[in-house]
UniProtKB/Swiss-Prot annotation:
<dbReference type="InterPro" id="IPR008867">
    <property type="entry name" value="ThiG"/>
</dbReference>
<comment type="similarity">
    <text>Belongs to the ThiG family.</text>
</comment>
<comment type="pathway">
    <text>Cofactor biosynthesis; thiamine diphosphate biosynthesis.</text>
</comment>
<dbReference type="InterPro" id="IPR033983">
    <property type="entry name" value="Thiazole_synthase_ThiG"/>
</dbReference>
<dbReference type="GO" id="GO:1990107">
    <property type="term" value="F:thiazole synthase activity"/>
</dbReference>
<dbReference type="Pfam" id="PF05690">
    <property type="entry name" value="ThiG"/>
</dbReference>
<dbReference type="GO" id="GO:0005737">
    <property type="term" value="C:cytoplasm"/>
</dbReference>
<comment type="function">
    <text>Catalyzes the rearrangement of 1-deoxy-D-xylulose 5-phosphate (DXP) to produce the thiazole phosphate moiety of thiamine. Sulfur is provided by the thiocarboxylate moiety of the carrier protein ThiS. In vitro, sulfur can be provided by H(2)S.</text>
</comment>
<keyword id="KW-0963">Cytoplasm</keyword>
<keyword id="KW-0784">Thiamine biosynthesis</keyword>
<dbReference type="GO" id="GO:0009229">
    <property type="term" value="P:thiamine diphosphate biosynthetic process"/>
</dbReference>
<feature type="binding site">
    <location>
        <position position="167"/>
    </location>
    <ligand>
        <name>1-deoxy-D-xylulose 5-phosphate</name>
    </ligand>
</feature>
<keyword id="KW-0808">Transferase</keyword>
<comment type="subunit">
    <text>Homotetramer. Forms heterodimers with either ThiH or ThiS.</text>
</comment>
<dbReference type="InterPro" id="IPR013785">
    <property type="entry name" value="Aldolase_TIM"/>
</dbReference>
<protein>
    <recommendedName>
        <fullName>Thiazole synthase</fullName>
        <ecNumber>2.8.1.10</ecNumber>
    </recommendedName>
</protein>
<keyword id="KW-0704">Schiff base</keyword>
Amino acid sequence: MKNYSSLIIGGKKFSSRLMVGTGKYKSSQDMVESLSNSETEIITVAVRRIKNEQSGENLLEKINWEKYWMLPNTAGCVNSDEAVRIAILGRELAKLSGQEENNFVKLEVIPDKKYLLPDPIETLKAAEILIKKGFAVLPYINADPILAKRLEEIGCATVMPLGSPIGSGQGLLNLSNIRIIIENAKVPVIIDAGIGVPSEASQAMEIGADGVLINSAIAQAANPPLMAQAINYSVKAGRQAFLAGRIKKQDFAVASSPEKNISI
């Protein structure tokens, strides 16, 4: 049974339901301000891109790791063997940052360079190996209810179906499948990829997602810190709306004023 009062992943409790990525920012200052404005507690770090090749900056030195929980990801991996190797490196990075107990990994296995769609077979294979190695696995997948359930059954800490392709800003294109995943899951469902604006983040939360992970929508906005703040508000509003319960849709109008006992 899901816990609706707080977000619990791998036995760790979080108050924020917004996860934020650290890539694509125009400057490290934009990134730091955006992270602060988002009020996130979990930030993703691409292990293979920890050092900015253009500026030479190291993410580990720019972020206060006492404030944020590191979620190393295996971006750039094209098969399960690569993903396992990078995940192990990511766990060591977390330890170097002072998070000795951090065994989280965002599992990405993406051989498709054009559409950046995850490989379901290699993802499942890597997840099985990593779980045996003691990782809390957060797998990035297509909106496939059967795969999501299988990953849950083998012990993944969450499932992370995409809303639409990475960085596309197309929003939630497969709502029916995402709804099925949410309905059937006993682990947190985090919508990852494709969200472009706050209203889409709110929509994900309104249908019952446990959280969202957002990078491009913030990092590539004209004003990233302001967008981070807007998305933070939208995630909170969407969650409250889900808990409050929306009205039933009708095929006809329903008067809001009483039709009986009218005094005038």
